[in-house]
Amino acid sequence: MKRMILLGSALLFSASATFAQTTMSGSDARIGIKAGVNLSTIRYSGFDGSSALNDNTKQNVGYNFTVFGDFGVGNNFFIQPGVSLQNKGTKIEGSSTSGGVTTSGKIKTNVMAIEVPVNAVLRIPTGTSGALQISAGPYIGFNIDGKTKTNTTVTTPAGSTTTNESNNLNFGSKTDDDLSSTDFGANFGLGYRLNSGFTLGANYGLGLSNLVPKDSRSGDRKATNRVWGFSVGYSF
């Protein structure tokens, strides 16, 4: 009997520990890191040829790295602030033919930004393996570095010529700047956290602020970020 009681107590303790890992109370806190791949574009409106510009826009492949904290405010509900390094941008590819001359071009824009997201996260336990996580919240970003690479090929009956050009981006509000220095928007995420602490996640970043420098915003000219992010991570 004593052995059965001890065994039963051990099983109850194990079950309680597993449940505690799966749920999160208002007093719990965790720190974690995650990293992964971004697929990003910039959407344009109000420009001459905005529709054609968006049609020729391709996803730019970048990366992300985030340090975050989970702070419980209720059972399976918590706030997740973080500091994130985000590599985003866009690619534009197009071609035109006139008088037997074909001009094709590729423009790749890479932007490095430091972002501060604050997400509200709902955790839905899935038995003893882990929990589904649904998140949403705002972010503010600061563009710190960037570069544009242009590849142009002109093809004539006599042959073709290719030129390459690379320029650093300037961030600010003046007409000679390339992009605004700040960005804000909203994140929407879906992920899964194993009881071991490992996480898998997907996130959609919807840029809401105008990336066109303030002094260049004639008419309704607007450019906004669109970013799909995929990551793996670990929380302690």
Predicted ranges, named:
Residues F68-D70, N119-R123, G191-R193, G233-S235:
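Transmembrane beta-barrel domains of outer membrane proteins
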Residues F77-I79, G197-L200:
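Repeated loop/turn-to-beta-strand initiation elements of outer-membrane beta-barrel proteins
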Residues G32, G62-T66, F78, E115-N119, ...:
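Membrane-embedded beta-strand positions in outer-membrane beta-barrel channels/transporters
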Residues T41-N60, K88-A113, N143-D183, S209-V227:
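Extracellular/periplasm-exposed beta-strand and loop segments of Gram-negative cell-envelope proteins
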Residues V37-T41, L85-G89, E115, I124, ...:
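Transmembrane beta-strands of outer-membrane beta-barrel pores
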Residues R30, Y192, T224-F236:
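Outer-membrane beta-barrel "beta-signal"
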Residues G26, G74, Q86, P125-S129, ...:
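Outer-membrane beta-barrel channels and translocator barrels
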